[in-house]
Amino acid sequence: MATVVLGGDTMGPERIFPNQTEELGPHQGPSEGTGDWSSEEPEEEQEETGSGPAGYSYQPLNQDPEQEEVELAPVGDGDVVADIQDRIQALGLHLPDPPLESEDEDEEGATALNNHSSIPMDPEHVELVKRTMAGVSLPAPGVPAWAREISDAQWEDVVQKALQARQASPAWK
């Protein structure tokens, strides 16, 4: 890590304030009465200047609930939308463009509906699907040991008791 030498002193990664021998800029000087920690005039002067390090300042938020009420404009109002976009640009924010309505998505949805309706779902086919899915089994490592040791009926009892206990206990707020 590089170090910078100023006036014979070394500066590390932490911020070092200039010492008495270095030149201070117009906004950087020590304020009078720094040894006195009372809440007198110097603090008020500091608040009035409004500029801190690197030009940042404190701006209090509105605390009056009556003034916070804002009427929402209709979405289609062009002047309001343009005004909002101007404000976003002035603040230096980037708002991504909304996704375009794609005709491909509509075609895919229509194709899916056509495919769904073309599958014959008569009672015989439903039973075939059920038998096929019943024959599907997960590999043994995918099922934890505790799940192999408890029957479905026992597991349903455990779940029901847990749900009843949760409903009976007072809700924590």
From Swiss-Prot:
GO terms for biological process: cell differentiation; spermatogenesis. It comes from the Eukaryota. Keywords: Developmental protein, Differentiation, Phosphoprotein, Spermatogenesis. Residues 1-78, 93-122 are annotated as: Disordered. This is Male-enhanced antigen 1. InterPro entries: MEA1. The modification Phosphoserine is found at S102. It comes from Macaca fascicularis. May play an important role in spermatogenesis and/or testis development. Pfam families: MEA1. Residues 38-48, 100-109 have a biased composition (Acidic residues).
